Every structure is written in structure tokens, then in C-alpha cells.
Amino acid sequence: MTLRYRLSASALTLLTATAALAEPITITDVAGRDVTLEAPAERVILGEGRQIFFAAVLDTEDPFGRIVGWREDLQQASPESYAAYAEKFPELTDIPTFGGFKDGTFDIEQAVALDPDVMIMNLEAKAATEEAGYEEKLAKVGIPIVYIDFREQPFDNTPKSMEIIGQLFGAQDRAAEFNAFYEAQMARVTDVIAAQENLERPLVFVERAGGYSEECCLSFGNGNFGTFVELAGGENMAKPFIPATFGTINAEQIIASDPDQIVVTGGNWEAYVPGGDWIGVGPGADMAEAKSKLAALMQRPGFTGVAAVDAGEVHAIWHQFYNNPYSFVAVQQLAKWQHPDLFRDLDPEATLAELHDRFLPIDYRPGYWVSLDPVSN
């Protein structure tokens, strides 16, 4: 239950039996803020529906048991994930949903009515949260915010974030077990790359959400999938042109750079762009359709004549790896594409299946990536 400073002595007496199960702790979140609250938290608001990707790891038996509200984005951004969880945990369809901080549709009164012990927010929402005064407003009604991060600095902050959430949920041992798995799986790539004296790094262009819009082309600069590429032994083509984490590369620059490999992030975004050209990779994806749409994207002006297309070095991978604790799987798959000889024995699909077997309550379904064949002359 929430640590409420205005509780009367009589109310505290009534709550003694429940409070005995929790105690005040101080957590330092990834934003460097010290947050004091009672843990384990019994009532949690998720600032994003896709945060179930970490909640399910730490509370596998009942991942929605403590969730009293969440942002309505999982069903739109990853409908297959939503369906898989809804099939096993139908109660998720009854969880109240709310708008976002960034677009100003979050309802303070609704949050208060849900009586949460804590609200977990992604670090990228912090600026909008502060600008709108939500942090201060929620603090005044006794609802603390804890920031976590799998997106801005994923490889620094994923273990930290899982440890923080483990403290919130009273699942420290589970968080430590996951972090050990995470670090071991990352080391299967980074240790090999670090051991190479004269590594030839392929030039890799990563298109962010290719086909989502007609714009060409969103990409990753110094961070996120751009860092994934580098950790996997590649050179991020967009890094010199995009100083921030995300940005845009024009078609002429792609042609001039002539990357060795092209990777497009994708997902089923029918809810956002009905009938769009996006690549619908993800759990249970139709691989034939994904491959066909990926081939069609390579017919755009920025990709015609690029050597990677003719060589069959064109791939698509699940976009949601960019903002959840499973990012190590993407790094393994990128390493497999970028250095097949070095990672002949690495099986990212087996890694993802093991992740599901050990840490998730839903079954593994393949479909998270696809590749094109070389162009035959």
C-alpha cells in the first residue's frame, strides 16, 4: 500500500496487519531521483502498456495481479503480444487505461481513483512529465513516480531498471536471475567481438519503422539500435549524420554511403497505419508476407542500386526490441547477420525460446526476423 503521510493514528492501527507485509524503502531510479515508498507495491500503474514485457518477467505467475491501470498502447503497438497475454490472462481486458503524458491526455483524477502505490514511467517521458507538472501533482496526492529505462541507454540501464522493479515488486531474486541471464547472453557477443584484433565491421543502415510512413528514412544515431549494431561488430551508417538517438537520413545519403547491410525494424502496426507498408515481424508473424513487404520496400529510390540489396544482405527485425529488456536477442541476431563466421554456433532463436521458457508466462512463437535472398541475375 502507498506510504501516506497524512494517515491518522487510528487509520494506521487499522492497517497494521497489511502494513506488516510491507516496509518503507528508498529507491534511486534511473533518473537519479530518490523515491521513498512502501514495498512490495500492491497497486501499480504502468506508464506504458508495453511495460508488461518486464512485469511478466518479475511476476510470471500473475503478471497483472498488481496492475491497476496502464496506458493503452500494447494492443496497438504489438497486437500479437496483447493477444497472447489476453488468452492466458483474460483479466487484462478489464484493466483501466489512460492517455499519455506526452500528448497531455493523462487524467490525474483517474490516477487518484485507482489508488496506486506507485507509477512506473519510462525515462523518455520525463521531460513531458515535468513540463506538464504531473510529477508534482501526483506527489501531492501521494503517488510516487519511479523512472526506468530500456530505450535511451538500454545496456547501462536495463540491469538497473530490472533491479529497481524487482525492489518495487519484492522480486529481487527474480530480477537478479534475469540480469545474470541478460549479461551472459550479451557476453556471448561482446566477448567474441572484443577478442578480434582486426575486426572488419560491415557498414549497416538501420531503418526505423520502415514503411510506417512515406518518409525516407527514419534511423538511429548514437544509441538504441545504432548501439546494437556496434556491439554486434558493425558500423552504424547513420551515426555521423544523426547526433541524437533518433533522426532522419535522406535517400541520397543511403545511396552515397552504399551500406553493406540493411536492417529494417518492423511490427504489426495495422492499428496505426491500416494496410501500411510496414514489415509485420513479431511473434507468430506471417513470414512470407513479411518477406514480400520487405522486398517491396527495397524498390524505393533510396535503395535501388545499393549493393546490400543485390547481395541479399537485407533484413527485418521486431521493432519492440528497441524498448524492452529482451534487447540482447536483437544484438545476437545482428551479430549473426554481421559476422556469420564468428557466430556460427550462436542461435538467437534458441535464446529467445529459452527466455520464454525460463522467464515468461506465454509460449514462444517464432517470427521476430526475416531476411531477403540475394538478387538473381
Residues covered by each model-derived region:
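Bacterial N-terminal signal peptides that target proteins for export
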Residues: M1-A11
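N-terminal ligand-binding lobe of clamshell/alpha-beta domains
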Residues: A22-N377
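N-terminal signal peptide c-region/cleavage motif recognized by signal peptidases
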Residues: A17-A19
